[in-house]
Structure formats: C-alpha cells, structure tokens
Amino acid sequence: MITLNIYICLFYVMVIVLQAQLKQSKGYVRFVTQVIQARRGLKEVKLIYEEEIKPEDKCMFGFFPHGVLAATVLVFMNFNNGPMKNMIGLGSRFLLTLPFVGLFGRLWGLQAVNAHSIKTLLGKGTNVGLLPGGFEEATLTVTDEIRVFIKERKGFIKYALEYNYGIYPVLAVNEHKYFSTFRYF
C-alpha cells in the first residue's frame, strides 16, 4: 500500500512539473469558449464602457464578483477587440499548481498572480485582468445576489500606481448565476 502511494505522489509531482511548462493553446481556448457560451448566463457577451479607454492606455482590470468558475475573466482574456484584447489573466499559484486544473488554466493562458509576474507584465505594458476577491469571494457566491470580498486587497493598487496603470473595475453581470449554489451547510 505504501508503494502505491509513492507512485501516486510521483505521478502528481510529474503532472505539476509538466503543466508548469505549458503555454496557451488557441485551439483549446476556442473549444472551451464555445462550451462556456453554451451554458446559461454567458450566451451573450457584451461590454459596456462607462468611459473611453484608448488603445495605448495601460489597463489593469479588476473583475468582480468571483463566481464559482470565474468564467468572465476566461472569456474576456481572449476577447478579439477593445482594450481587453491580448489581456493576460492572473490566477492564484494554488490554482495553477493543482494537478489537471492548473493544466487547463495554463492552456487557457493564465499566469500566476505574484509580485514577480505582475512586475514583469506591467513592466512590458501588458494589460492584465485579476480577481481581487480571490478564493474568499468565490466561497461567498450565491445565485440570488452579488457578493464582493475586497477586504485588505490593496497590493494590486500599489503596482498599478507604481507602473502608471489605470484600474478598471469590471462588473461581471450574471457570473454568480453560472452555477447553482447554496447558502449554508
């Protein structure tokens, strides 16, 4: 029994190491986009801008609320026009390290949200999208109201100011309705 556990551990370590080397796959993105749009809540994707964003503007998009899947970030990461075109989505290191889940995130084009990757991307002038509420906000998701968790989340604002980026909040309407949820155990 112990040897079986060692093989399983080695397998998962190998998966984690291999998936860390993956880059975005456009074919995978097209396929999953079609699947996501077939689900309820994301059949129509529309952007409504409260103010003009010029193509040369450096943008940091903060998406909220973080639903169960955070599908809105995934859809807009590969939007084919506007300021979100070529936006890099940032996800937690934990998500990107999980076996198989991290594989799908990396194929989609997600990168780790840590100081090094943010400084590198912002230093290049790349538009980025992130979910300031993170896992905590995802656990608050219910289908009948929008809930946001932003307490003590100010590091991204520091980087935006340091690299002269505009911060644009993005309300993902119906993100919380994408999956059925329940309020309490």
Protein language model features and the residues they cover:
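Cytochrome P450 catalytic-domain "roof"
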Residues: 45-52
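Catalytic core of membrane glycerolipid acyltransferases/transacylases, capturing the structured
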Residues: 11-33, 39, 53-124, 134-151
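Phosphate-binding P-loop/Walker A region and its immediate neighborhood
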Residues: 131
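A cross-family acyltransferase "interaction/gating" segment
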Residues: 95, 134, 140-185
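Short aromatic/hydrophobic-glycine micro-motifs
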Residues: 45, 109-110, 165
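Membrane-lumen (extracellular) interface motif
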Residues: 1-9
